[in-house]
Regions:
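Structural motif
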Residues: 46, 123-125, 182
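N-terminal helical cap/lid subdomain that shapes the substrate entry/recognition surface
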Residues: 2-107, 111-116, 132
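Asp-based, Mg2+/Mn2+-dependent phosphohydrolase catalytic module
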Residues: 1-4, 107-115, 127-247
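Glycine- and other small-residue-rich loops at beta-strand/loop junctions that grip anionic moieties
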Residues: 99, 123, 156
């Protein structure tokens, strides 16, 4: 990796909230409020997308489509997406307050990068009202990044590269080849690849981890979309970067 200048982290499941529990709990509660029971697996499947897109993707799940038709007598439409999205925020804020602990090694890895003159930034699929709470909770624990972008800051969220370009603008760092994206979902990888960055995927702290039995399949999923490196957690980042020549 030549002249690494900037590391862009995802937040939930990468820096905070082991297992990315807050979004899962929020979406289950949101759909329950609408009279639709969804499983953790269904709630997790679109993880990494902006939250409106996350809701749209859940509604396209065949089981959810069938249940929605049974409850409402018609398919879900854009009005329903908008209504659910408006109702989503209180559920997410409540869940963030429960699941906002820093992931072990996050502070140490950020400190290690800064000591080497490497800037640190974050991108998130949360809307600003929720993202601001995430950043505050992290700051209260001693972690504050140099720049942040959320879904509301750009025209299109992941898998588009626009949030990465936004934090590159905020830090005045370029080219993309000097940027590394670290996250726990497929959309994180796609965001990084579409921006022209290197990408690292974390296994054990994200929503997809279901114990060692899931290691091989999850690793394969990340590698199939082109991630450059799979690591267990953000705690492993300094060692991996140090072993790469010319960082």
């Amino acid at each position: 990796m030549n002249s690494l200048k900037l590391v862009v982290f995802d937040w939930a499941g990468t820096l905070i909230d082991m297992g990315s529990k807050a979004p899962v709990e929020a979406f289950i509660a949101l759909f329950a409020e609408a009279g639709i029971a969804i499983s953790e697996t269904v709630a997790k499947a679109p993880m990494g997308l902006g939250k409106r897109d996350h809701i749209k993707t859940i509604l396209k799940n065949p089981l959810v489509e069938s249940e929605w038709n049974r409850v409402f007598g018609r398919p879900a439409d854009d009005y329903d997406v908008d209504r659910l999205y408006r109702s989503y925020e209180p559920h997410q804020i409540q869940a963030i307050r429960k699941f906002s602990q820093l992931i072990p090694g996050a502070m140490e890895s950020v400190s290690w990068l800064r000591k080497r003159g490497i800037k640190v930034a974050g991108t998130t699929g949360y809307p600003r009202s929720v993202a601001s709470l995430v950043w505050k909770e992290a700051k209260d624990q001693g972690l504050e990044l140099d720049a942040n972008a959320c879904n509301c800051d750009v025209a299109y969220g992941r898998p588009s590269p626009l949030m990465i370009f936004k934090v590159m603008e905020l830090t005045n760092l370029y080219p993309p080849s000097s940027v590394l994206k670290v996250g726990d979902t497929i959309p994180d990888v796609m965001e990084g690849k579409n921006a022209g960055c290197k990408t690292f995927s974390v296994l054990k702290t994200g929503s997809g981890w279901e114990g060692e039995t899931s290691r091989k399949s999850l690793t394969n999923e990340f590698e199939l979309v082109g991630t450059d490196k799979v690591i267990d957690s953000v705690a492993d980042l300094p060692g991996v970067i140090e072993n790469m020549k010319g960082y």
